[in-house]
Amino acid sequence: MVLPTLAIVGRPNVGKSTIFNRILGERVSIVEDTPGVTRDRIYGKSEWLGKEFAVIDTGGIDLGDEPFLAQIKDQAEIAIDEADVILFLADIESGVTDADERVAQILYRAKKPVVLAVNKVDNPERRQDIYDFYSLGFGEPYPLSGTHGIGLGDVLDAVLAAFPSEDKSVEDDSIKFSLIGRPNVGKSSLVNAILGENRVIVSPIEGTTRDAIDTKFEAVDETFTMIDTAGIRKRGKVYENTEKYAVMRALRAIDRSDVVLFVINAEEGIREQDKKVAGYAHEAGRGIIIVVNKWDTVEKDNHTMKDFENLIRQEFQYLDYAPIIFVSAKTKQRLQSLPAMIVAVSENQTRRIQSSVLNDVLMDAITVTPTPTVNGKRLRIYYMTQVAVKPPTFVVFVNDPDLLHFSYERFLINQLRQAFDFSGTPIHIIARKRK
């Protein structure tokens, strides 16, 4: 059963992201004292008094004429539709504003339980001003200080009381994957095309998607959690504090992923920054699928795809294990193949090989290509065993670990790939001296 869901809603700059972070106990939203900085909704999971629930942080609702603010409003309304309870946040410093009243009108139409909280009540003297917020029509307003965490317990008590009575949490065994790549390679458009719902703000402005958004969906009889990350920016261009934090958070999203979709813009080709972006996922040992997006915009002949694939293999030699797929978020070309590919790579990440079978392959490999000699001393490999998954990790017991040159280690990895299906996942080999 789906967890009960709380959506935090309010006009810009009332402290929604601060409260969201307080509830989750970790910094998930990007907090900056600028209206509109929380550009998209974010999902998280929390617990209060033994009850688990999901939390949605939204961009500020603003009914101004700016197209970007209209998109934020749309995202907030989607979050409202998905929520069981709405936490309507205002702030004591501004008092009841016209924007608060317009937000209230949206919430009246939602016909969902609403808990009204007034943020920035950082000292007792300010509590007397809270009664002005009764005029919003949602009953007793709860005083709250996001900065100090004061009053949050009372707010969460009210939220839990308003949740539906069912309390059946579900263990998350979904396949988690993220989309990484330079800004403006089309990650958000890919997310929308895969989901068929505008869950992520799509804009031609580079760097629009600042946070990682967790979204569950089902396909090919599997449950997936998709984490859409902010584009990783060139170091010289990352000058805003918010963008710097978004890069950090994108890397954390990679750490949370089982599989990473590394997205390249077919129009722009391969850039130096692409290599650094892919390196993050490779070094983290994640499963990787290379997704060439905007393929519909490229003029093609019979050799175009093969030539582009060869270029990728040349520029990303360390990703020789990663499958490549050419797609178009706009036309949805080949997107139907992605879920099955993700499942296959996830299975390969967790594949375990029996030691007896493993050592048969090892002995055959040594017979074909004998171990090298270094300074007159030959490497002797006695046996191999698998010690971990995600990524598959093998220990080879040898007479001297220093004799295992990286070229022979690479040979052994290639032999494992030929014998077993490890497509999409790196393989680690550790040499240990036999005692």
UniProtKB/Swiss-Prot annotation:
The keyword Nucleotide-binding applies. GTP 2 binds at residues 181-188, 228-232, 293-296. One of its GO terms (biological process) is ribosome biogenesis. GTP 1 binds at residues 10-17, 57-61, 119-122. Keywords: GTP-binding, Nucleotide-binding, Repeat, Ribosome biogenesis. Residues 351-435 form the KH-like domain. One of its GO terms (molecular function) is ribosome binding. Residues 4-167, 175-350 form the EngA-type G domain. InterPro entries: G_ENGA (IPR031166), GTP-bd (IPR006073), GTPase_Der (IPR016484), KH_dom-like (IPR032859), KH_dom-like_a/b (IPR015946), P-loop_NTPase (IPR027417), Small_GTP-bd (IPR005225). Associates with the 50S ribosomal subunit. GTPase that plays an essential role in the late steps of ribosome biogenesis. This is GTPase Der. It comes from Lacticaseibacillus paracasei (strain ATCC 334 / BCRC 17002 / CCUG 31169 / CIP 107868 / KCTC 3260 / NRRL B-441) (Lactobacillus paracasei). The gene is der.
